[in-house]
Amino acid sequence: MHFMTALRAAWRTRNSLLCVGLDPDPTRFPAHLHGQPDAIFRFCSEIVDATADLVCCFKPQIAYFAAQRAEDQLEALIAHIHARHPGTPVILDAKRGDIGSSAGQYAVEAFERFGADAITVNPYMGRDSVEPYLEYTDKGVILLCRTSNPGGSDLQFLDVGGGERLFERVARLVADEWNQSGNCSLVVGATFPNEIARVRELVGDLPLLVPGIGAQGGDIAATVEAGRSADRTGLMINSSRAILYAGADHDFAAAARRAALDTRDAINRHR
C-alpha cells in the first residue's frame, strides 16, 4: 500500500478526515475483557471493525502496547486492519528520533515488523536521522512540527534567525527539502489553530496530522478552517479517548461508532 495514495483515496471515498487513535488502556476496558490475555487486541479490533468505514486512517500509539508487553498484539492488530479493511492506512505513532543507524532499525521495526503504512518521527536530530524512513518511499513519514502539548512552546517558538520560529523552520525544511519522494506529512496540534494556519501557509497541500480534539479540547471548527487544503481535504484529525471510551460495557464498540460518526460529521460540517 502506498500511504499517500491510500490516504487520498480514503478522504474521497469515505468522505472523512477523521483519524481514530488506538491508545488502549486496560484499566478502562469493559469488565468482560479484564484478565483476558488478548484483551488489547480484542478491544482495539472491535473498535476498528466498528469505525473503519468512518475514518481516513488509524493511529495506534506504540507505548500503550509496549507498556503491556503487547507488541505481538499490535502486530496482529495492524495485520487485522489490512486484511479486514483493505486500503485503510495505519500510522504507527512512535515519535522516533535517533541517529541514522538506529533510525534504520526503527524504520525496519515500523514498516517490516509491524507493517505500518506511516510513522511519526521527531526531526530534532536533523535530516540524517530522518533519511532511513524517507527511503521507504511508499511509506508516510510524519514529522513533529507544532505539537498539542502545553510545553511545546518551550522549544518550538524559539527564534532560529530572521524572525523564523523553530516550528516554521521544520515546516519549511520538510516541505521544501525533505519531501523529495512526496511521502512527508507534519504533526500540528488542534490546540493551536493560528499555528495550523501558519503551517498550512508554508507547506501548501502537504497532509497534516492534527491531534488534540476531543479530550484535549481542540476546537473542530477552528482546526478545519485553519488546516484544510485547497480541495478541502489535507487533514487527518485525530481523536482517541473520546471515541475509544465512549462506552464502558459490552456495547463499547457501538458507542465508539456513534462517537466516531458524530466527530466525522462535525468535521465535515466545517469543510
From Swiss-Prot:
UniProt keyword list: Decarboxylase, Lyase, Pyrimidine biosynthesis
CDD domains named in the record: OMP_decarboxylase_like (cd04725)
GO biological process: 'de novo' pyrimidine nucleobase biosynthetic process; 'de novo' UMP biosynthetic process
E.C. numbers: 4.1.1.23
Catalytic activity: orotidine 5'-phosphate + H(+) = UMP + CO2
SUPFAM superfamilies: Ribulose-phoshate binding barrel
GO terms for MF: orotidine-5'-phosphate decarboxylase activity
Residue positions of the active site: 95
SMART domains, A to Z: OMPdecase (SM00934)
The keyword Isomerase belongs to this UniProt entry's keyword annotation: no
Pathway assigned in UniProt: Pyrimidine metabolism; UMP biosynthesis via de novo pathway; UMP from orotate: step 2/2
Claim: Glycoprotein is one of the keywords in the record: no
HAMAP family tied to this protein: OMPdecase_type2
Membership in a protein family: Belongs to the OMP decarboxylase family. Type 2 subfamily.
Protein name listed in UniProt: Orotidine 5'-phosphate decarboxylase
Native source species: Aromatoleum aromaticum (strain DSM 19018 / LMG 30748 / EbN1)
Protein's gene: pyrF
